[in-house]
Amino acid sequence: MRIIGLTGGIATGKSTVARILERHGIPVADADQMARQALAVGSPIRERVLQRYGRAIQDPSGALDRRQLGRIVFADAAERAWLEAQIHPFVKARLREFLEAHGASAPPEEATEARPSCQCPHGEGHPTVCLMIPLLFEAHMENWASEIWVVTCTPEQQRQRLAQRDLLTAAEIEARLASQWPLEEKARRAHVVLDNSGSLAQLEAQVRQALGAHPREGGAICPTPPSRIE
């Protein structure tokens, strides 16, 4: 089975690539959506978060103020690490369920390889699935995928998209960018690099080319220098 690990920098266009893949009939698991589910009303994780931060992350109606929570954790690495320690196990469990539902198996929980593994999970199911994991490298989850795709754009585009999409201040944008690996390092470790600095049509063409290239044998892909899809 071909398991695409889709990642990149914040606001580089990962969700756009995911939608393109879905139009090609490829199932996509969204780790960000799973993280939001972890903080849903009634979840024990949400209760622990509220116990830790209290009214500081609640709006006047009592609902969870995600932007205020973001201000706290992106300003303090220790708080961000605590929050990730609450959410990541939940997300990994949901990703594991997704893979099993499509006939694959996730790596052992103790396995943490620094590079993508040549041992691709086997199974009878959909021939290609995608795990969209924004923090794939930061969470050391490279070995969950048989190949890694990194979506890039220019730094100026990243900042512009964050300002328009999330209504963040310049300081908030820089804090979020600083919390992730440099985009250049992610691209260096990728099997496929998708340049999303152009048009949607150009991005779609790159995705089609990457899907067709499929440089594998026997259901696995070995670490190779990244392929830049133009």
UniProtKB/Swiss-Prot annotation:
Residues in the signal sequence: none
One Gene Ontology MF term: dephospho-CoA kinase activity
Primary localization: cytoplasm
Subcellular location: Cytoplasm
Pfam families: CoaE (PF01121)
SUPFAM superfamilies, per database record: P-loop containing nucleoside triphosphate hydrolases (SSF52540)
Enzyme class: transferase
Residues given in the record as ATP binding sites: A11, T12, G13, K14, S15, T16
The EC number(s) this enzyme carries: 2.7.1.24
Pathway membership: Cofactor biosynthesis; coenzyme A biosynthesis; CoA from (R)-pantothenate: step 5/5
GO cellular component: cytoplasm
Keywords linked to the UniProt accession: ATP-binding, Coenzyme A biosynthesis, Cytoplasm, Kinase, Nucleotide-binding, Transferase
Record GO biological process: coenzyme A biosynthetic process
Residues in DPCK domain copies: 3-225
Reactions catalysed: 3'-dephospho-CoA + ATP = ADP + CoA + H(+)
Superkingdom classification of source: Bacteria
Protein purpose: Catalyzes the phosphorylation of the 3'-hydroxyl group of dephosphocoenzyme A to form coenzyme A.
NCBIfam families: dephospho-CoA kinase
UniProt family annotation: Belongs to the CoaE family.
Protein name per UniProt: Dephospho-CoA kinase
Species of the source: Synechococcus sp. (strain JA-3-3Ab) (Cyanobacteria bacterium Yellowstone A-Prime)
